[in-house]
From Swiss-Prot:
Major subcellular location class: secreted
Gene3D superfamilies in alphabetical order: 3.10.450.10
One Gene Ontology cellular component annotation held by this UniProt entry: extracellular exosome
Known tissue expression: Expressed by the venom gland at an extremely low level (at protein level).
Molecular function in Gene Ontology: cysteine-type endopeptidase inhibitor activity
Cystatin domain: residues covered: 29-129
Family assignment from sequence similarity: Belongs to the cystatin family.
Site entry: Reactive site: G29
Name of the featured protein: Cystatin
């Protein structure tokens, strides 16, 4: 009795093709790397910096130096996982009129010997159809 090898060969080719697919396409809701220059990532980063400054007890604003890494996850909306570097500025916080992101980014930095840099990890949850964005997690050191 002769058995055809065609179904086995076709199955092996299919298996190899599936293994070559990026892992994010195989796991619904999984994390996917994102470019730090992606407009959605930049918007989430701006929101994170604004919220960090609103929530922190620091007397001075911190501005974004750079986005180190970005990932996203499709949930009910999009969740952005950001690693960012922030730097303390010379702009003091004043009660009643908080600065917006663009104003903070224009703040001067202190002299090099007095500079304080933070590495922060933020999770930003965006649901545009509800016009709602939330900072769901924040840690800086």
């Amino acid at each position: 009795m002769v058995h055809s090898q065609l179904p086995v060969a076709a199955s092996l080719r299919l298996l190899c093709a599936l293994l070559l697919l990026p892992s994010a396409t195989m796991i619904p809701g999984g994390l996917s790397p994102r470019s730090v220059t992606d407009p959605d990532v930049r918007e989430a980063a701006e929101f994170a910096v604004q919220e960090y400054n609103a929530l922190s007890a620091n007397a001075y604003y911190y501005k974004q130096l750079r986005i180190v890494e970005a990932q996203s996850q499709v949930v009910a909306g999009a969740k952005y996982y950001l690693t960012m570097e922030l730097m303390k500025t010379k702009c003091a916080k004043t009660t009643g009129k908080p600065k917006v992101y663009k104003e903070i980014q224009n703040c001067e930095l202190p002299p090099k010997a007095q500079q304080e840099k933070l590495t922060c990890r933020f999770q930003v949850w965006s649901r545009p159809w509800l016009k709602k964005t939330e900072l769901t997690k924040m840690s800086c050191n």
